[in-house]
Amino acid sequence: MNYYIIGIGAAIIIITALLYWLYSYIFPEKSKVSSKNYLFNTGIRSIPLDELKNPTSKTYSIELWLYINTLPKTETAIFSYSPSQSVSLIIDPHNILTFKNTQRKEQSMKITNIPLRRWVYIVINVKYNLVEMYMDGKLVDSGKISSRYINSISYEDSITFGSIDAYIAGMNRNTKLLDLETIRKQYYKDKNDLRH
Protein backbone atom coordinates (compact mmCIF):
# COMPACT_ATOMS: atom_id res chain seq x y z
CA MET A 1 0.00 0.00 0.00
CA ASN A 2 2.77 2.49 0.93
CA TYR A 3 4.63 1.76 -2.32
CA TYR A 4 1.46 2.50 -4.23
CA ILE A 5 1.04 5.92 -2.57
CA ILE A 6 4.74 6.75 -3.05
CA GLY A 7 4.48 5.75 -6.72
CA ILE A 8 1.42 7.95 -7.28
CA GLY A 9 3.11 10.85 -5.48
CA ALA A 10 6.24 10.50 -7.62
CA ALA A 11 4.13 10.30 -10.78
CA ILE A 12 2.26 13.49 -9.83
CA ILE A 13 5.55 15.32 -9.19
CA ILE A 14 7.00 14.17 -12.52
CA ILE A 15 3.84 15.11 -14.45
CA THR A 16 3.74 18.52 -12.75
CA ALA A 17 7.39 19.15 -13.63
CA LEU A 18 6.80 18.11 -17.25
CA LEU A 19 3.73 20.36 -17.54
CA TYR A 20 5.67 23.30 -16.09
CA TRP A 21 8.55 22.70 -18.53
CA LEU A 22 6.12 22.43 -21.46
CA TYR A 23 4.28 25.59 -20.38
CA SER A 24 7.52 27.58 -20.06
CA TYR A 25 8.65 26.35 -23.49
CA ILE A 26 5.37 27.26 -25.20
CA PHE A 27 4.90 30.56 -23.35
CA PRO A 28 8.33 32.22 -22.88
CA GLU A 29 8.79 34.73 -20.10
CA LYS A 30 8.37 38.32 -21.17
CA SER A 31 9.81 41.40 -19.60
CA LYS A 32 7.54 44.33 -20.21
CA VAL A 33 9.85 47.09 -21.29
CA SER A 34 7.00 49.44 -22.01
CA SER A 35 3.38 49.06 -21.03
CA LYS A 36 2.20 52.27 -22.62
CA ASN A 37 2.86 54.42 -25.64
CA TYR A 38 5.92 56.62 -25.46
CA LEU A 39 6.39 59.78 -27.47
CA PHE A 40 10.11 59.79 -28.14
CA ASN A 41 10.58 63.46 -28.93
CA THR A 42 9.95 64.39 -25.31
CA GLY A 43 13.41 63.20 -24.31
CA ILE A 44 15.46 60.12 -23.60
CA ARG A 45 14.20 57.43 -21.28
CA SER A 46 16.12 54.43 -20.04
CA ILE A 47 15.27 51.18 -18.31
CA PRO A 48 17.88 49.41 -16.13
CA LEU A 49 18.59 45.86 -17.32
CA ASP A 50 18.23 44.47 -13.82
CA GLU A 51 14.48 45.08 -14.23
CA LEU A 52 14.40 42.52 -17.06
CA LYS A 53 14.31 38.73 -16.80
CA ASN A 54 17.66 37.13 -17.68
CA PRO A 55 19.01 40.34 -19.26
CA THR A 56 22.42 39.00 -20.25
CA SER A 57 21.07 35.90 -22.01
CA LYS A 58 22.64 35.23 -25.39
CA THR A 59 19.30 33.99 -26.75
CA TYR A 60 16.37 36.41 -26.65
CA SER A 61 13.82 38.23 -28.75
CA ILE A 62 12.63 41.81 -28.71
CA GLU A 63 9.17 42.70 -29.96
CA LEU A 64 7.66 46.15 -30.26
CA TRP A 65 5.09 48.22 -32.08
CA LEU A 66 6.54 51.32 -33.72
CA TYR A 67 4.73 54.36 -35.12
CA ILE A 68 6.97 56.87 -36.89
CA ASN A 69 5.47 60.28 -37.65
CA THR A 70 8.45 61.76 -39.48
CA LEU A 71 11.92 60.50 -40.29
CA PRO A 72 14.84 62.03 -38.38
CA LYS A 73 17.32 64.31 -40.13
CA THR A 74 20.23 62.14 -38.98
CA GLU A 75 20.67 58.50 -37.98
CA THR A 76 18.88 58.17 -34.61
CA ALA A 77 18.59 55.28 -32.17
CA ILE A 78 15.14 54.00 -31.35
CA PHE A 79 16.79 52.07 -28.54
CA SER A 80 20.28 50.96 -27.62
CA TYR A 81 22.03 49.16 -24.81
CA SER A 82 24.08 51.72 -22.89
CA PRO A 83 26.86 52.26 -21.91
CA SER A 84 28.21 49.17 -23.73
CA GLN A 85 26.50 50.28 -26.96
CA SER A 86 26.64 46.62 -27.96
CA VAL A 87 23.43 46.69 -30.01
CA SER A 88 21.09 49.38 -31.28
CA LEU A 89 17.92 49.69 -33.32
CA ILE A 90 18.35 52.75 -35.52
CA ILE A 91 16.22 54.66 -38.04
CA ASP A 92 17.85 56.91 -40.61
CA PRO A 93 16.67 59.72 -42.94
CA HIS A 94 16.48 57.23 -45.84
CA ASN A 95 13.77 55.19 -44.06
CA ILE A 96 15.99 52.24 -43.18
CA LEU A 97 15.54 50.54 -39.83
CA THR A 98 18.80 48.87 -38.77
CA PHE A 99 19.62 46.49 -35.92
CA LYS A 100 23.37 46.47 -35.50
CA ASN A 101 26.22 46.06 -33.19
CA THR A 102 27.48 49.54 -32.66
CA GLN A 103 31.15 48.57 -32.64
CA ARG A 104 31.16 47.09 -36.17
CA LYS A 105 28.77 49.00 -38.37
CA GLU A 106 29.15 46.66 -41.34
CA GLN A 107 27.44 43.91 -39.34
CA SER A 108 23.78 44.77 -39.36
CA MET A 109 20.28 43.60 -40.27
CA LYS A 110 18.01 46.03 -42.13
CA ILE A 111 14.38 46.69 -42.91
CA THR A 112 13.85 49.21 -45.71
CA ASN A 113 10.80 51.36 -46.41
CA ILE A 114 9.25 51.40 -42.96
CA PRO A 115 5.69 52.73 -43.36
CA LEU A 116 5.20 56.17 -41.83
CA ARG A 117 2.19 57.19 -39.74
CA ARG A 118 0.97 53.65 -39.10
CA TRP A 119 1.80 51.02 -36.49
CA VAL A 120 4.46 48.49 -37.54
CA TYR A 121 5.19 45.30 -35.57
CA ILE A 122 8.93 44.60 -35.30
CA VAL A 123 10.46 41.40 -33.89
CA ILE A 124 14.19 40.80 -33.50
CA ASN A 125 15.34 37.25 -32.65
CA VAL A 126 18.93 36.89 -31.39
CA LYS A 127 20.61 33.52 -30.81
CA TYR A 128 24.28 34.10 -30.04
CA ASN A 129 25.39 35.74 -33.30
CA LEU A 130 22.40 34.80 -35.47
CA VAL A 131 19.83 37.56 -35.92
CA GLU A 132 16.42 37.57 -37.60
CA MET A 133 14.28 40.66 -38.20
CA TYR A 134 10.54 40.48 -38.80
CA MET A 135 8.11 43.21 -39.79
CA ASP A 136 4.34 42.71 -39.59
CA GLY A 137 4.69 38.95 -39.21
CA LYS A 138 7.13 38.40 -42.10
CA LEU A 139 10.86 37.62 -42.06
CA VAL A 140 12.65 40.49 -43.82
CA ASP A 141 16.33 39.96 -42.98
CA SER A 142 18.58 37.46 -41.25
CA GLY A 143 22.28 36.95 -40.84
CA LYS A 144 25.20 36.98 -38.44
CA ILE A 145 26.53 39.72 -36.20
CA SER A 146 29.77 39.26 -34.28
CA SER A 147 28.83 37.58 -31.01
CA ARG A 148 31.77 39.30 -29.33
CA TYR A 149 29.84 42.56 -29.44
CA ILE A 150 26.21 41.54 -29.56
CA ASN A 151 26.56 39.41 -26.44
CA SER A 152 28.65 41.85 -24.40
CA ILE A 153 25.59 43.12 -22.54
CA SER A 154 26.14 43.54 -18.81
CA TYR A 155 24.01 44.27 -15.76
CA GLU A 156 25.43 47.80 -15.74
CA ASP A 157 23.72 48.48 -19.08
CA SER A 158 20.29 49.96 -19.53
CA ILE A 159 17.97 50.13 -22.52
CA THR A 160 18.07 53.76 -23.63
CA PHE A 161 15.46 55.21 -25.96
CA GLY A 162 16.33 57.81 -28.57
CA SER A 163 14.64 61.11 -29.30
CA ILE A 164 12.61 60.94 -32.52
CA ASP A 165 9.10 61.87 -33.65
CA ALA A 166 7.63 58.42 -33.02
CA TYR A 167 5.68 56.24 -30.62
CA ILE A 168 6.51 52.82 -29.24
CA ALA A 169 4.02 50.41 -27.66
CA GLY A 170 4.11 46.95 -26.15
CA MET A 171 7.86 46.49 -26.16
CA ASN A 172 8.82 43.10 -24.70
CA ARG A 173 12.13 41.34 -24.25
CA ASN A 174 11.49 37.59 -24.28
CA THR A 175 13.83 35.03 -22.77
CA LYS A 176 13.39 32.75 -25.80
CA LEU A 177 13.15 33.14 -29.55
CA LEU A 178 9.71 33.67 -31.05
CA ASP A 179 8.81 31.27 -33.85
CA LEU A 180 7.08 32.49 -37.01
CA GLU A 181 3.66 31.17 -35.99
CA THR A 182 3.81 32.98 -32.63
CA ILE A 183 4.98 36.19 -34.33
CA ARG A 184 2.08 36.08 -36.80
CA LYS A 185 -0.50 35.34 -34.10
CA GLN A 186 0.79 38.21 -31.96
CA TYR A 187 0.84 40.55 -34.95
CA TYR A 188 -2.81 39.91 -35.85
CA LYS A 189 -3.95 39.98 -32.21
CA ASP A 190 -2.19 43.25 -31.37
CA LYS A 191 -3.00 44.83 -34.73
CA ASN A 192 -6.69 44.65 -33.91
CA ASP A 193 -6.09 46.02 -30.39
CA LEU A 194 -4.13 49.03 -31.70
CA ARG A 195 -6.99 50.05 -33.99
CA HIS A 196 -9.23 50.72 -30.99
Model-derived segments and spans:
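Extracellular glycan-associated modules
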Residues: M1-H196
